[in-house]
Every structure is written in C-alpha cells, then in structure tokens.
C-alpha cells in the first residue's frame, strides 16, 4: 500500500543474485503478513483491533515513505527491519478486515481473491520478465495513472460520506487492478534488466533489492485487495 521510487531502482547496477533476492524477500514478506493475519484470526484479536484498521493503513504508508526518504542513510539491517515491520503492519491491516469480509460474504470470496491474485501476479511477472518489448513509456503512464487513482480515491472517500456510489467504487477498483497488474509487468522487467548488470555486493545493492522487493510485495497485495473488493461487490449484487 506504499509507493516507492521505482525510477531510482531501474538504473542501478546490481549483482546477478539480485533477482532471486528480490523475489525471496517478497515471498518472506508475504509469509510474515499471512502469519500475522492468521494469528489475529486464530486468537480472535481481530475483533478488538478492527476499529483501529485505519491506524495500520497509515502506519504502512509512514514506513514506506520513511524508507524512501532515508534509504541512503539506513543500514542494511535497518532496511530489513523496516521491511519486516511493513509486512507485520500489512498483516495487522488485513488481519482485521479480511475476517469481516469472510463473515459477510463467505470465505469463498476471500479464497477466490487470494487464488486469482496469485495467478494474475505470476502471469504478469512472467510476462514482464521475458518480454523483449521496452516498457519504459508504459511505466511512466502507469505512474501518472497511479497518482490519478489516489486523487480519485480520496475524492470518492469524501463524496461517499454523503452519497453512496457503489458502481463508481467498483470502477475505481477495476482501474486500480489494471494499474497494479501493469506495474507488476514493468517492475518485473526492471528486475530482469538490473539483474543482468554486473556490480559488487555492497550495501546499496542489497538495499535496492529490498526496495524492489517491497515494490513487488505492494503490487501483489494491491491486486489481492482490489480483487477482494470486486468479488465482494459481485456477491453483494446477487
């Protein structure tokens, strides 16, 4: 749910282990998020924490902005710690909201969104990793679209306090899904590009691989989130 400096990572020269490091940390982050969410559900703590879901949301934004602003000054262990903190906070966010969706729409909606997100992310990342087309221009368009999505979402949040507009929200969810699928493709191509470059194993290269792991983590999380909204909306209209 955070935004990262993607252009900063695209032109860096990194060692050959960069790609496996990125996806390894992304997977670790997702595992931490899943375990945190499951822990809240198993203990029933999500009921008490549900009113504070917005705190976890803003906390993830704060961590992501801090990493982006302080990446040059932070040590590798510090970035690792912040990455894990981000993953835990996302687990707190989803751990308080997903059980509510499951109770209202059924667990099948959650599992359908989870499985679909995994398939869509995998196919998108594979295409980005193996396509020979230059996606640089598409990346710039997607970043502008992402800014527009944030503005539209904030405007919708304000207007919806007075007038419910479920169809407009559904359109926003589809737009968000398209944007993050596209970002997955271009980020995967960026990972492949820098992975082919030859560089040392210094701290900067490791920190940059963690940043790109966060980017891919954010992509798959947001794909899941928008799919969950879409599936829940479809179930509600039946």
Swiss-Prot record:
Record-level Gene Ontology MF annotations: calcium channel activity
Chain ranges passing through the membrane: 22-42, 49-69, 78-98, 105-125, 141-161, 166-186, 208-228
Source organism superkingdom: Bacteria
BP terms from Gene Ontology: regulation of proteolysis
GO CC term (a single one): plasma membrane
InterPro entries noted in UniProt: Bax_inhibitor_1-related (IPR006214)
Membrane topology classification: Multi-pass membrane protein
Compartments (UniProt record): Cell membrane
Keyword terms of this UniProt record: Cell membrane, Membrane, Transmembrane, Transmembrane helix
Family per record: Belongs to the BI1 family.
Protein's UniProt name: Uncharacterized protein CT_819
Annotated organism of origin: Chlamydia trachomatis serovar D (strain ATCC VR-885 / DSM 19411 / UW-3/Cx)
